[in-house]
Amino acid sequence: MTDSEETVLYVEHRYVCSECGEEYPSLEEALEHQQSHAAALQEPQYQIVGVNSLENQYQCLECGLLLRTPEDLLAHQELHPTQNEIQKPKRPTRSEIHYECPECKALFNSQDVWMAHRYTHMQVQDVSHSKIVLQTDDHVIEDGLQLMCAPAVPSEVHLVTGDPHFHVSTPSSASVSHTQVLVDLEHSYKKNEGAGEDCAMELLLYKCSECTQLFQTPGEFLEHQGTHFSGQERISDTNSHLDQTPQLSLNGQEKEPIINQGNTCTDYQAENKELLVQPEGEQAEQDSWTVDREPVFSCGDCSETFQTTKDLEEHQISHQNGPFSCPLCSKVFPTYPEVGEHLKSHRSESRYLCVDCGLAFVSEAVLLNHRRSHLANPLFTCECGLTFLNMTRFLYHRRVHSSKQPDTGAVEEKKTVNSIAPSPAGNFHCDPCGKDFPLLSQFLRHQRFVHALERRHKCPTCGKHFKKGSHLRTHMLTHTGERPYSCTVCSKSFNSQANLLRHRLTHTGEKPYKCQLCGKAFSQSSTLQQHQYVHGQAYLYKCNECGINFHRPYRLLLHQYHHTGEYPYKCQDCGLSFLLKRLLEVHQLGHRGEEPHRCRECGTNFPSVQRLQDHRCSKAGDGGGEKLECPICGKKVTSDAHLNTHVAAQHSGNKRSNVSSGKGTPVLPRNKLKGGGGKNLECSDCHKTFSTETSLQVHRRIHTGERPYPCPDCGKAFRQSTHLKDHRRLHTGEKPFKCDVCGKAFTIAVRLSEHKRIHTGERPHSCPDCGRAYRSFSNLWKHRKLHREQQVQLQEPESQPADLSSTVAILETVETIPIIETVEIFPEGSTISVQDIQFETLQVENIHLGNIQIGTL
């Protein structure tokens, strides 16, 4: 046969009769044939003299089980796997504790299966070696099970269960002759089937010789017997009790225990009394069945009595002094009852065996943890040399080394704790922070968590560490976005209750934290602490890009966004980004065709009416827009703090302690507010002086040409972040500052202030040389620049004609235009016309001369 040829095999299944060897193509035909052998299939070990055999018994060819109908046999055959069925892969072998059968040497991994298997050997021995004798009236069946037929009584069975009201009702049986008795060897009860009279079914109860506990089935009895022994003792002792049968009494008459003839067994102990099972109404004076339990052994220490010497010995161990160790493992317990409770874990099904020492464990995790003890080096080793088998204890030990200074030991720690004494007031005072604690435990906890800098709670998301677990749980809400605490006034939600309480102060207006230097109040203690840095010039937060210092961390964070040009809040419609979320929400109103809600005092826009109501405008003040005026120069400011700062910065030479605001807050000198007097910071390039370091740093960018704030839209850079903020409104088209008189809007507040002076006619900026006044400071600065140029020209008369520098014209328009507003013209009364003027320094595009206002000085 070549390799290319295919071989087809036809397999035909046939069923062979186990009695005569005939073959049949189907199981149904084989079952019908076996009906002829039904009489021959009757097993003599189950046949009792005088009892007719059952008809139509069908035996399973796999396990030999007898069934009554073919349908039952077919249903039973489905439980056996066929040969063509794919075998499941075997589980990997693991260390298990097996139970060995002493008869056939079979191994079982479950105690229940082992007990059930041992019971099968007991049945075979009972049937093969014992005599089967039937008694119809007064005789006894000597097969290991007693058969009793009571007189005609109600069909009830009374069990000795401890509950006198517990009983089981069974239907009465008829249609069977009085001599036909069926004994069911697979159960612990017998069936009396009599004809013409009712017969009660009585259960055979099994009594433990050690603890006098009762059981209904041999399996439960044998399993319980195994709990009184361990190891080989359990198996050997169980063998001695397998063939013993419980003792029953018929009509109150005690019987001797019946032992199977074929087995060599030991008798029950003398104190093992018989169980009395009687029908109801048989003995009126007895309300319930009792079992004689006479304590014969007493303890000499506590006079407690016991039924067996084993119980007495176990009890006497409890009077000994601990510790007690487990005989199966190395665990130690302070009392013996705890050892007994621990031994129950070893009696359970421990299937995980240690190959090194032979100890068994319930779970694989416990076994792996135990096997670390057999390693040469333990798994968890600390830097100080200590080793741990348990990870939890190792982590707890590492807390000792978490502080900056190493721990010197438990002895020194106890000395430190003992040396702490309460103050005369009864409190424990903390020197670093000044807090008082009523209890020593609270004081030590404060020292450990606050001043030891021990942060052992780590966030799994960002890796940040916290001192307390509650702080970590609050921090985790920032990653999930959950805000479970909401304000009942404005419906704002917060991720912690502390933030909610701080927010409520904005509704009540309460500011409990007040600065002692300037009188300014704050709602949070941290804000007051940061404010005090201003007085002491303590700017702790420095920008690494430009070197500007800030006294608040969030100011530095907002400042750093200007360097990168990437703002955190981006519009999804047009792609513009914003520094604040409020600005983004106001911008998105324009996409929806809605108008923002604007504050009339300061011109700030808000996305909702509620946000506008929550806004407390500093320009409005408590007096409806009234400002505080400086008594020295007349400048108006919005608050006491601004007035004190202004006086200290601008008028440090005039030390006026009587300058006060409407609230009577005294103005402190400059040296008390900021630790120094006047403008003591000088620029090394131009020798200009400044009052703050921030102002000096911003000024020095003029000399260095540094522009650290680029525009993310066009790339243009600026020296200050405020200039960038104003510039970005050109891209967005936003003009939040609107004139109340004419309705004209501007991008910055300065332009609006200059525009309002047109309506009022106010010219606050005057020239000190000629006395001319201007509406804006920029126009005054440009005007004074001309005076400086005139002085230069007077020093060099030959460079310019003398008659060309006598008059100056200032061009002013209603709207600001990008032109140079100063020109030089000929004196008045000259014959030269306006058209002959030479505009050398004036750049005008698409502007007629009629729109230019020409004036003379």
Curated annotation (Swiss-Prot):
Domain of life assignment: Eukaryota
Polar residues bias locations: 651-663
Keywords, ordered alphabetically: DNA-binding, Metal-binding, Nucleus, Repeat, Transcription, Transcription regulation, Zinc, Zinc-finger
Renumbered residue ranges of the record's region Disordered: 648-678
Chain intervals annotated as zinc finger (C2H2-type): 15-37, 58-80, 99-121, 206-228, 297-319, 324-346, 352-374, 380-401, 428-451, 457-479, 485-507, 513-535, 541-563, 569-591, 597-619, 628-651, 681-703, 709-731, 737-759, 765-787
Pfam families linked: zf-C2H2 (PF00096), zf-C2H2_6 (PF13912), zf-met (PF12874)
Molecular functions per Gene Ontology: DNA binding; zinc ion binding
Cellular component GO terms held in the UniProt record: nucleus
Subcellular location: Nucleus
Family indicated by similarity: Belongs to the krueppel C2H2-type zinc-finger protein family.
Function summary: May be involved in transcriptional regulation.
Protein name per Swiss-Prot or TrEMBL: Zinc finger protein 574
Organism: Xenopus tropicalis
